[in-house]
UniProtKB/Swiss-Prot annotation:
Official protein name in the record: Proteasome subunit alpha type-5
Source superkingdom: Eukaryota
Phosphothreonine modifications at: T55
GO CC, one annotated term: nucleus
Organism of this sequence: Saccharomyces cerevisiae (strain ATCC 204508 / S288c) (Baker's yeast)
Similarity comment text for this entry: Belongs to the peptidase T1A family.
Alphabetized UniProt keyword annotations: Cytoplasm, Nucleus, Phosphoprotein, Proteasome
Function: The proteasome degrades poly-ubiquitinated proteins in the cytoplasm and in the nucleus. It is essential for the regulated turnover of proteins and for the removal of misfolded proteins. The proteasome is a multicatalytic proteinase complex that is characterized by its ability to cleave peptides with Arg, Phe, Tyr, Leu, and Glu adjacent to the leaving group at neutral or slightly basic pH. It has an ATP-dependent proteolytic activity.
Note: Present with 17100 molecules/cell in log phase SD medium.
Residue numbers carrying Phosphoserine: S56, S251
Record-linked Pfam families: Proteasome (PF00227), Proteasome_A_N (PF10584)
Lineage, opening ranks: Eukaryota, Fungi, Dikarya, Ascomycota, Saccharomycotina
Length: 260
């Protein structure tokens, strides 16, 4: 006798007769409510950009942390439940440090992503010999970007289901559908790092409800020379200004209307 739909909903490790895990599907839906995050990989580096939503005018935008460093050569952007992201990021940092201590080398990007996705599967009752870590799947997705000697610049999308894929360009969050369509049109293999920075800002501007500025958007990049770095507000403001000038040069009529 089959269980009811509500009973399958509550069972995080029980498949429905259709072969579905509803709690995992719900966790994927939670990500669609999160702020938009975009990653673009180029031959010069990887760029990450996120929308910083302020739920109150009294909220300090600097306290909204959507892009974080995992190691000197790896960083990530998140969309979904920030509290869940903290657990995944701490696990990733521990994995990176442990690998460095044991092997005296930096962990490669794919191995670290695999470690994070292994953690994402540790929910429910737990397998034999494994500790149950969580009562439900994580409600967050990560864009993990980095550089290593084996595979160069890489961008991975890690889901709450434990699935991960490598992308040249990827968008997650509430504006991901429109952003991904724009990435399909705009991305090409010869993109420079500067072009990728401006493309991320351009797409964020299109999908965000608020006017784009240095307080509600954040950028970071990873290069072989400088490692991972998050741009400060001044650097972000300069890039936004450069984007506006570029758009004005391409379509002066629209720029005149916007200025008026």
């Amino acid at each position: 006798m089959f269980l009811t739909r509500s009973e399958y909903d509550r069972g995080v490790s029980t498949f429905s007769p259709e072969g579905r895990l509803f709690q995992v599907e719900y966790s994927l839906e939670a990500i669609k409510l999160g702020s938009t995050a975009i990653g673009i990989a180029t031959k010069e580096g990887v760029v990450l950009g996120v929308e910083k939503r302020a739920t109150s005018p009294l909220l300090e935008s600097d306290s909204i942390e959507k892009i974080v460093e995992i190691d000197r050569h790896i960083g990530c952007a998140m969309s979904g439940l920030t509290a869940d992201a903290r657990s995944m990021i701490e696990h990733a940092r521990t994995a990176a440090v442990t690998h460095n201590l044991y092997y005296d080398e930096d962990i490669n990007v794919e191995s670290l992503t695999q470690s994070v996705c292994d953690l994402a599967l540790r929910f429910g009752e737990g397998a034999s010999g494994e500790e149950r870590l969580m009562s439900r799947p994580f409600g967050v997705a990560l864009l993990i970007a980095g550089h290593d000697a084996d595979d160069g610049y890489q961008l991975f999308h890690a889901e709450p289901s434990g699935t991960f894929y490598r992308y040249n360009a990827k968008a997650i969050g509430s504006g991901s559908e429109g952003a991904q369509a724009e990435l399909l049109n705009e991305w090409h293999s010869s993109l420079t790092l500067k072009e990728a920075e401006l493309l991320v800002l351009k797409i964020l501007k299109q999908v965000m409800e608020e006017k784009l500025d240095e307080n509600n958007a954040q950028l970071s990049c990873i290069t072989k020379q400088d490692g991972f770095k998050i741009y400060d507000n001044e650097k972000t403001a300069e890039l936004i200004k450069e984007l506006k000038e570029k758009e004005a040069a391409e379509s002066p009529e629209e720029a005149d209307v916007e200025m008026s």
